[in-house]
Amino acid sequence: MDLIAQIEAEQIAALGKDIPDFRAGDTVRVGFKVTEGTRTRVQNYEGVCIARNNGHGIAGSFTVRKISFGEGVERVFPLHSTNIESITVVRRGRVRRAKLYYLRSRRGKSARIAENTNYKPKSGASV
């Protein structure tokens, strides 16, 4: 393991976050800390993960898309952000692409993703 990867692994271990194994196509619920004035609360953001960027490293991020009041809303979350309180996998999707940007141009039933009922976690991955 080279020096940079070793430092990244130490930083990830120091954060002590338990990040579930999820990928593009999965419906996830992200508990994100929002500061309004002096108080802080947790806001849940639930939608389809359409992309994972930079893998599992310290710079990793993922994009979640949801439909809110008829408008598509996308939000990019840093994977190891201190503002993320929890990531929960609601539903496993069966897709054949790593990036689901084509969902941006789809509406209604054509934007649905089939559920993966035969999901098997990778060895050593937390569910």
Swiss-Prot record:
Please tell me whether the keyword Ribosomal protein is annotated for this protein: yes
Q: Name one GO cellular component term.
A: cytosolic large ribosomal subunit
What protein family does this chain belong to?
Belongs to the bacterial ribosomal protein bL19 family.
One biological process term from GO is: translation
Matches recorded under PROSITE patterns: RIBOSOMAL_L19
One GO molecular function term of this record is: structural constituent of ribosome
In terms of InterPro entries, this protein maps to:
Ribosomal_bL19, Ribosomal_bL19_CS, Ribosomal_bL19_sf, Translation_prot_SH3-like_sf
HAMAP family xref list:
Ribosomal_bL19 (MF_00402)
UniProt keyword list = Ribonucleoprotein, Ribosomal protein
| Disulphide-bonded residues | none
What lineage does the source organism belong to? Answer: Bacteria, Pseudomonadati, Pseudomonadota, Alphaproteobacteria, Rhodobacterales
Question: Know the name of this protein?
Answer: Large ribosomal subunit protein bL19
Q: What does this protein do?
A: This protein is located at the 30S-50S ribosomal subunit interface and may play a role in the structure and function of the aminoacyl-tRNA binding site.
Domain of life, per the record?
Bacteria
A Pfam entry, by short name: Ribosomal_L19
Organism the protein comes from: Roseobacter denitrificans (strain ATCC 33942 / OCh 114) (Erythrobacter sp. (strain OCh 114))
Tell me which PANTHER family the record gives: LARGE RIBOSOMAL SUBUNIT PROTEIN BL19M, RIBOSOMAL PROTEIN L19
